[in-house]
């Protein structure tokens, strides 16, 4: 669809029909815009993309704090669109109604198939309102399932709600459902909130990640419910200062850091805290995964107060994540790897759907170091004992650990595996990060 750029005069005329709240003597002027004022139909059939573009341009060009409302009781069909900043002042996007995607993948032809609702270079944006963003991804999933190259077809599906190069963004109190692929993505963003969300898609919908964080910093993902076909939360690239709390995850693939180091890249995932989570009926619980041949670190990670129920692989570190990694190693061939260490597992309890409850499959080139298991109790569903597997994994145990830990002691690292624990960055004096 060709989106037309309206003239400033027309924008001014359209803005004239909205409600302008300018209270005499008020400390802050506010402007209220609604999508319908810009010609939106909201019947779920008409293409309302141009109305959204015009409304966004009006809001973005306003000098005052602006509220842009997607009214309740209506469904607005929006085709692939980019809403760009920078804007002149704060924008509050209130999604009270429904925003739905076109059902057919054909509507992405000639454009960027990787995006649906794309925000670029925006600061001070709050998205809330209690409404629904529905990707209607069924036809995309069918393409992936029926294609001879299903993985490639799934990878080509668009990200539903995508923020790139944005700052001070909050997405709160929405339902995101049936995404074509990832539901909510933050790429190279800082100071981000994604709270009080309900994110759902069928268990077998390919690649339907809940929240994907890519090279973003100072991120809070809290008080959310995920029931998806992929990872509930996935953290990749160079992410730091990430906080996950009060999350329900399942079904899906659990919570994942990585894969890091894909195609010989340098990635650092650091200062990541996750606690107070319930993970049920998932393929994995909490997972750290890295590619061979990559560089960088996964360090200062805490998993705490997590209850697992019928999880196939509750705790896993996999430093040989994919044999399909084709990039040139960023270090010495056959001797480079992302360094994994300073990973704490505290108060992890529940049941494993498989015999192996803990897997630490670390790299020969760069073994895992400074792992810590504190009060871990994972038993097998239906009774029976679970087990743990370790390869080149070093660390310590505190309190009772079930199944019995297989971690090697750290002093063995210094004597036998000097490359282990070669984590980059200062590790002293920051125990309370």
Where in this protein do the model-derived segments appear?
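Extracellular/periplasmic carbohydrate-active domains that bind, remodel
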Residues: 2-433
């Amino acid at each position: 669809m060709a989106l037309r750029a309206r003239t400033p005069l027309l924008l001014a005329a359209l803005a004239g029909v909205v409600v302008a709240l300018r209270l005499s003597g008020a400390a802050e002027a506010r402007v209220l815009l609604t999508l319908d004022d810009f010609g939106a139909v909201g019947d779920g059939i008409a293409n309302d993309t141009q109305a959204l573009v015009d409304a966004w341009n009006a809001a973005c060009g306003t000098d005052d704090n602006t509220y842009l409302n997607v009214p309740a009781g209506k469904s607005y069909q929006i085709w692939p669109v980019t809403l760009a900043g920078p804007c002149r002042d704060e924008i509050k996007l209130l999604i009270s109604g429904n925003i739905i995607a076109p059902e057919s993948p054909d509507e992405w032809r000639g454009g960027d198939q990787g995006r649906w609702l794309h925000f670029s270079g925006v600061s001070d944006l709050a998205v809330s309102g209690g409404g629904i963003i529905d990707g209607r991804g069924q036809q995309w999933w069918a393409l992936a399932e029926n294609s001879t190259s299903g993985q490639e077809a799934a990878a080509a599906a668009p990200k539903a709600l995508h923020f790139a190069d944005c700052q001070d963004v909050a997405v709160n109190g929405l339902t995101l459902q049936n995404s074509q692929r990832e539901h909510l993505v933050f790429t190279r963003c800082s100071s981000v909130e994604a709270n009080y969300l309900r994110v759902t898609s069928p268990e077998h919908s390919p690649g339907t990640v809940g929240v994907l964080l890519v090279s973003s910093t100072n991120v809070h993902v809290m008080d959310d419910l995920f029931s998806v076909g992929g990872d509930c939360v996935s953290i990749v690239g160079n992410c730091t200062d990430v906080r996950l709390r009060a999350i329900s995850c399942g079904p899906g693939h659990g919570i994942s850091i990585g894969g890091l180091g894909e195609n010989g890249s340098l990635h650092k995932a650091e200062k990541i805290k996750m606690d107070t989570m319930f993970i049920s009926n998932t393929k994995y619980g909490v997972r750290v995964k890295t590619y061979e041949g990559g560089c960088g670190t996964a360090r200062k990670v805490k998993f705490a107060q997590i209850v697992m129920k019928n999880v196939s692989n509750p705790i896993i570190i996999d430093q040989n994540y994919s044999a399909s990694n084709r990039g040139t190693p960023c270090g010495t061939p056959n001797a480079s790897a992302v360094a994994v260490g300073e990973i704490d597992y505290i108060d992890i309890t529940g049941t494993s759907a498989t015999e192996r409850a803990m897997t630490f499959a670390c790299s020969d080139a760069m073994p895992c170091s400074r792992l810590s298991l504190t009060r871990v109790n994972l038993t097998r569903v239906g009774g029976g004992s679970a087990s743990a597997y370790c390869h080149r994994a070093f660390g310590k145990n505190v309190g009772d650990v079930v199944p019995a830990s297989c971690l090697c002691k750290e002093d063995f690292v210094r004597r036998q595996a000097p490359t282990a624990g070669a984590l980059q960055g200062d590790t002293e004096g920051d125990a309370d990060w």
